[in-house]
């Protein structure tokens, strides 16, 4: 089955949009949306295999060659910095990676005057590099969810997190202060697979490119 193309995709909205996008280039993977606990799906007719994995694990499966292609948010790629080929911005799943703080603090706060701050985030690597470029010393507290809670209980003054509509921030009394990056979903490719399966992978990339 070495001639199969294996794609790693995370669950959730990215999975739904990916299935729709692949359908536009004749790759039928509707089975991925079925109510099942299966993690591997195979389409023998099209010689395709799909792996359902955690979003943060997609780059690892692709880097080690367990998957030829992967679909994942740019935020994960920025944080992990894997050695991967990233040929295509799929242009869905848009959000912003932001620095946010309590609205009361923001009233007379000047980010350009920051010298030593504490930040809670799921993205310690991105956060550290961002503030290092600005010459700001930062103490980073790594969290895995509900980042907005940190300023409310005094764990940190500020957070770095993804923001879509901003509604969650507003409901928790936080405001956006700085934008670190704009985030969308990306197609990633294992570098060895790009050489050994070049015709098929190139066909997929070029097909998707026409629909994004």
From Swiss-Prot:
GO terms for molecular function: ATP binding; ATP phosphoribosyltransferase activity. Its main location: cytoplasm. It is found in: Cytoplasm. GO terms for cellular component: cytoplasm. It catalyses: 1-(5-phospho-beta-D-ribosyl)-ATP + diphosphate = 5-phospho-alpha-D-ribose 1-diphosphate + ATP. Disulfide bonds: none annotated. The keyword Cytoplasm applies. CDD domains: PBP2_HisGs. It is an enzyme of class 2 (transferase). Catalyzes the condensation of ATP and 5-phosphoribose 1-diphosphate to form N'-(5'-phosphoribosyl)-ATP (PR-ATP). Has a crucial role in the pathway because the rate of histidine biosynthesis seems to be controlled primarily by regulation of HisG enzymatic activity. Lacks the C-terminal regulatory region which is replaced by HisZ. Heteromultimer composed of HisG and HisZ subunits. This is ATP phosphoribosyltransferase 2.
